[in-house]
Each structure stands twice: as structure tokens, then as C-alpha cells.
């Protein structure tokens, strides 16, 4: 059983930590070894985003490097690997295991079979249909439903990052606490108002860093990338050699088939949004469907390979989590502190105390900083970089000498500051606040996936107009049914996800529910105001 335990851990962390980092370099080699060397030296190390906590947040920029690859040169395995580093991260396993325990194994199988696989192949058809479009989802909507809805899609893609930005400084603070104190007690020693105030200060500081332009971004990313890459290799090396050195007791005992069967009730249903949140992001790979050799066959093959890779990673990771943490007695702060607990346990296996955990906490702090800085800058520039003056006021697009959209940054600051401080009125401790923001992300982020399915339904409806190289389902009624199913399932997950995962009808539960309902409407609704402001400005 020790061998099984460490084999699972090794496979999981090898997939999530080492392979994605290596792939970033490997994909680029198609353009020549000289280019690969330059990329490794100047871009690869500076821009590795931590695999333990996030899916890559600047992948759009990474993938743009692949534009140097000659036309039709990408193969199915290139597509699969590029997509894998877009979609997957360690946090996907941690968060869903914390919600469901080992039952999540069944949930992963369901999600991959009936949602993620058709979702990935839908993305393939849309990318093939609009092969010359560079705006992703907004381009798809613009061609099928007009520029007005295309603007709203682009706005949705940006504004859903606001809860993410509000949570990132929390993660930095937690990582610093583990690095300095060796445990998670820092966030318990101060009031939630004081901690969130410090969180806001951290956000303002790193927004200033982001506003300094690409030089500061590269410095932060370089340090973070090297640190997390080293920790990834270290974990893999220690995990694979542990069976010969240590003895490990499995935390979850008496595992049977019944352990994996969910009890379908309202509590279980409210956790589906986190699963949907975990598997999103495949649409970022769509611009490369027509750079694939024989895209009608190889692109769907790559997407199916992606589904298998992610499924294996999710299931092995969940089993490994069950071996480290008792599925029947999940710690209340597992979402908040799981990464540090894992390295702490690894240190215990090797009689190293907290050394590994502290090293990881420091590396993760740098990684979280890089993720925050890039996420402040990149999505906003995507929204404003090709803005239509009919929908976005010119004043919002004004930039400084560094190319920073000043007013766009100010808008981001206002929204994030509200989302950081407002919850302190009704949420009493930092652990619950962290989990609330994470669950809010699982409600808000999938809203952008809805536009993918809207575009697919529109393309199916206009099938005579578009002739893509790759078609997911040629039977029109069946294709329409699949598109409607994916849209409805995503919407259902978002709606049920708004209910807090805690004792119902308490004061804090009611407060969290109110915020979960209001936040998506307010954030998306703000996008309806800017066309009015733009119209007023243009009339003058």
C-alpha cells in the first residue's frame, strides 16, 4: 500500500508540476532549437506560473509564442499538452476534495464524460469556424450575434476576474504566515477587518507594480518561476524515493466502492460549480485549431487526449488526497491550507520538520505575487486593447507612458476594494472568508463559459453559412441538443453554487447568500452602463 500511495502521488504531481513546465519549452521547439534556447533563457523561466495553486494565468501570452510555429505544424499531442497546461492545476483537486471527499472520484468521471469532453470538442469546432479571429469568444459572438453581444461577452470575460483578484492577496498573506510562523495561525491572530485591510494594501502595492510595465512584470515572474520550478522537481524527487525510505499510514481507512458513491442531496448539488470551474479554460486553445496538421482528425484527437489526461490527473490526485487526508473527517481549513499541510507531512516522512513546508511557502508567496500581477494587467488589456468606441468610452482606454490603462486600473481597484472589504461586515473569520471568495469564483468564473455554448448554438443554427474544417457533430438536432445541455448544465452549476457550503439559515449563511446573488448581477450589469457612457461621450 505504501508503494501504491507514493506511486499515485508521484503520478499526480509529475503530471501537474513537472510535465506542464517542460511542455512550455517543448512546444516551441518546432520552430527550431535556436528559438527554443532563446525562449528558455528569456521567457521560459521568467513566466512559469505555480502549478500547485493555479492554472496558468498568462497562457494566452505563452501560446502567442507558438504563432512562430509554421502553419499546419502542430500535431494532436501538441494540442493536448498545450491545452493541459491551460486547464489543469493542483488547486482543482484540493478544492473539490475539500468539498466532497473521495466521492469526488465519481463526480470527476461524470464531469469528464458528460460535460468536459463535449465542451472541449465544441471549442475545437468554434476555433475552426472562425480561424481568422483573434478575439476568441468575443469574435465568435460578434460574427454570429452582432457587436453588442460581443462586447458583453468580452466584458464578462474580464469582469469575472474581479473575485479572483480579490482573493489573490489573501493567498499571499496566508503563504507569508506559513513561511514566517510555520503554521496557519497568522490569520487567526487578528480580526478579519485588520487582515482584509492588509489584503487591500497588498493589492494596491502589487497594482502599482503591475502599472510599472513589462520590466517589473518580468522581474517578479522570473523569481517566481525559478522558485516554483525547483520546488516542483524537489517534490517529485522526494515523492518517488519515499517508499524505500519511509513508512506512510493511509489516512482514509476501509475504502470500499461505497466510499466513492455520492449521496445526491442539495449539499452535493451545490458543490458542482467548483467542478465546472475546475475544468474550464479550453477555449484559450481554439486559435490553434487551424495551425494543426489535418485539423479535422488531429484536433479532436488532441482534445480527447486532453480529457483523458485531466481525468487521470484528477482521479489519481483525489485518491492521493484521500491517502493523506481522512475523507470522512476533512479539516475545515483544507481549502485554505492544504498545500502547506501536504509539504508539512512530506517533511514529517523524512524527519525534516517544517523545512520543506517553509521553503514551499516562500516559493508559493512569490508565485502568488506573479499570478496577481499578471492577472491585474493581462485581462484588462485584452478587454481594452481592441475596444469598440461605441461600447467602451475612450477615457477608459487612456494609457500612460508604460502602456498601462490608468482609468482601467482605477476601475479594477474600486471593484476589488469593495469585494475585499464588504464581506467583513458579515463574515467573522479569515478561513470562512477565503472559502467564500473561492466559492464565489466558482459561481462567477463559469459565466464566461456560457458564451462559448451560446456561440456554438448560433453556429449550429447558421450551419449553412459556416464551413469549418472540423465539425464536432454533423447531425444538427443532436449538435443543438449538446450545446443546450452544456449551457444548461453550466447555468445550473452557477445557480446552485450560490448557496453557501455551511449551516443553513444562520446570519452568516444569509449574508454570504446575499453577496453570492448580488455579485454576479452587479459585475456583469456594470457592463451595461459603459455603452451608455460611450454614447454620451461620442455625441459630444
Regions found by a protein language model. Name each.
Residues 21, 36-106, 110, 116-124, ...:
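Membrane-interface "cap" regions at the ends of multi-pass membrane proteins
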Residues 142, 170-194, 231, 291-295, ...:
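Helix-loop-helix connectors at the membrane interface of multi-pass transporters/channels
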Residues 138-141, 146, 302-373, 392-441:
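TM-loop-TM module centered on a large, flexible mid-protein loop between adjacent transmembrane helices
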Residues 21, 72, 105-106, 189-194, ...:
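Helix-loop-helix junctions that connect adjacent transmembrane segments
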Residues 70-71, 399-402, 449-502, 511-512:
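C-terminal membrane-solvent junction of multi-pass transporters and transport-like membrane proteins
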Residues 71-79, 195-197, 293-296, 305-310, ...:
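Loop-to-transmembrane helix boundary motifs in multi-pass membrane proteins
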